[in-house]
C-alpha cells in the first residue's frame, strides 16, 4: 500500500513539474518563443497554414501562453490528479519489481565454466619456405 501511495505522489509531482521543463525545452519560454527552436518551427508552420498569422486558441498560441504565464491552478490540479492515478497504476504493477533469479540445476551446463579440457597448443610452428 505504501509503495502505491509513494508512486502516486511521485507521479503527481512529476506530471506538474514536467510541463514547464518540456515547454521550455521546446522553446516556449517566459520571454516568448526562442529562435531556431521547435516552437519557432511550429509557429512558422501555423502562420503559413493560416495565411500569415497564428490564430488565437490554436495549439501554438496555447503553448506560448502556458510557457509565458504557466498553468492555472485548476490545470495543475488536473495534471496532478492524472499523474497520481498513472503513478499508482504503474507502482502497483507486478513488472515494477525485479523477478527472482531462477536457480541453476547441478546437471545443467553453467556459462563461463570450462566443461572439458582446453585445446592443446601446437607442438611446433610450421613455416612454408619457397
From Swiss-Prot:
Disulfide bonds: none annotated. It comes from the Eukaryota. The chain crosses the membrane at residues 8-28, 43-63, 66-86. It is found in: Mitochondrion membrane. Residues 93-130 are annotated as: Disordered. One of its GO terms (biological process) is intrinsic apoptotic signaling pathway. Plays a role in the apoptotic process and has a pro-apoptotic activity. This is Interferon alpha-inducible protein 27-like protein 2. The lineage of its organism: Eukaryota, Metazoa, Chordata, Craniata, Vertebrata.
Amino acid at each position: 500500500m505504501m509503495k502505491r501511495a509513494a508512486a502516486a505522489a511521485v507521479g503527481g509531482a512529476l506530471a506538474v513539474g514536467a510541463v514547464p521543463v518540456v515547454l521550455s525545452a521546446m522553446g516556449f519560454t517566459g520571454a516568448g518563443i526562442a529562435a531556431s527552436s521547435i516552437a519557432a518551427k511550429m509557429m512558422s508552420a501555423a502562420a503559413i497554414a493560416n495565411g500569415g498569422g497564428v490564430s488565437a486558441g490554436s495549439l501554438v498560441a496555447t503553448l506560448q501562453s502556458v510557457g509565458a504565464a504557466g498553468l492555472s491552478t485548476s490545470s495543475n490540479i488536473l495534471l496532478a490528479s492524472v499523474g497520481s492515478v498513472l503513478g499508482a497504476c504503474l507502482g502497483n504493477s507486478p513488472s515494477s519489481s525485479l523477478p527472482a533469479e531462477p536457480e541453476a540445476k547441478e546437471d545443467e551446463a553453467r556459462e563461463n565454466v570450462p566443461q572439458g579440457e582446453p585445446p592443446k597448443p601446437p607442438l611446433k610452428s610450421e613455416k612454408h619456405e619457397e
